[in-house]
Amino acid sequence: MASINRPIVFFTVCLFLLCDGSLAQQLLGQSTSQWQSSRRGSPRGCRFDRLQAFEPIRSVRSQAGTTEFFDVSNELFQCTGVSVVRRVIEPRGLLLPHYTNGASLVYIIQGRGITGPTFPGCPETYQQQFQQSGQAQLTESQSQSHKFKDEHQKIHRFRQGDVIALPAGVAHWCYNDGEVPVVAIYVTDINNGANQLDPRQRDFLLAGNKRNPQAYRREVEEWSQNIFSGFSTELLSEAFGISNQVARQLQCQNDQRGEIVRVERGLSLLQPYASLQEQEQGQMQSREHYQEGGYQQSQYGSGCPNGLDETFCTMRVRQNIDNPNRADTYNPRAGRVTNLNSQNFPILNLVQMSAVKVNLYQNALLSPFWNINAHSIVYITQGRAQVQVVNNNGKTVFNGELRRGQLLIVPQHYVVVKKAQREGCAYIAFKTNPNSMVSHIAGKSSIFRALPTDVLANAYRISREEAQRLKHNRGDEFGAFTPLQYKSYQDVYNVAESS
């Protein structure tokens, strides 16, 4: 009997482990390889033979903010499969709950506030009971009838430099409780495998209405209404157990405040007292560095999530990319580079995107490189940079200056070089792969360092000495390069040879 059951037990255990691993990969959206992607390919006919710097071409005003739209009808946006929006939320402004058909990364350029992504099926872990004033003397039975309870899912406080990850179809809202406007750039990947609709961004409003940005050339103003507008008030009343009057309020038929509304008296939200105290004392940054930079790195640094480390409901949705202590590479004379990918920010497995923040000092140069497995959407946050991009035919497809507020799309495999101007430069690059990789041409861990000297000498018809210089002039630098002249390179090389 035991000999008969042993193979069955072994088969059952193997089947369970296989299914459990598959479930974990589905939950975390993890690709089987860094080289693979779940994105759809670009439409046929995409040539990428002329790149350009983009700025918002139109804006839509709401009661308490502005939504600025980039020209997503441009071929470059359509070929890379991304949509970009910049939002300005004024103090006490509330971005109404909505969800999108594509996964998004949000970078907070300025300001601070609160956001609340709502994940389906997750519990409302923030709970509190209130009692109306003047009820303390009532009996227990009477008191219960005068109590009401508020509960909601976890809310997240954000600040300047945070990257917020929003999976496709996850509703979220945002509130500015600071004293300056919140400025945020939203990059949505509509070619993501999670989007099974047509390849264009669709925002589904749960509240309010907004002006249609596509109608800016028309004489008649058009509005996009929220999802409840299409249902009858009778069905809404029955579904929610509310009156017809309240059901009509859900439809917001006469609400022209837009998607960002003003909360005159501010929001009353459940928040842990310690978080508020940390914010008031200005200690949030150091606390986050200890908790997220130390503990979280040791927990997830292996890059092998098993489905138990971080569940769907408790995933961190934000990470600060501006913190200098998080820099992956740093040159005190040139700048720093910080990467966010699924290894240190696991929710990016669901979003299938990643981000890189680059800070270049005065006249510093970023090593020429190409993106191996992703398109790159570069947004300048500070300063100016001279940028050149070259395609597979050796043709310069972009040669110009990028300044603050401008955006450049760099296609996969195209070679790019960036040089900061006198005031320096800072930018964030959104990548269409959760584990984006680049191949540097110069410096440490570069292509030239990996090639034999004789290969370089014969490939470029130069002497072996020149080939050695080509390999080692930037041999001690990685990523951000110090602005040196050729003579300085030669002096450094001669000193190294003599020693």
Curated annotation (Swiss-Prot):
Keywords: Disulfide bond, Seed storage protein, Signal, Storage protein. Seed storage protein. CDD domains: cupin_11S_legumin_C, cupin_11S_legumin_N. Coiled coil: none annotated. Residues 1-24 form the signal peptide. Residues 51-248, 319-468 form the Cupin type-1 domain. Disulfide bonds join 46-79, 122-313. The gene is GLUA2. SUPFAM superfamilies: RmlC-like cupins. It comes from Oryza sativa subsp. japonica (Rice). GO terms for biological process: seed development. This is Glutelin type-A 2. Residues 280-300 are annotated as: Disordered.
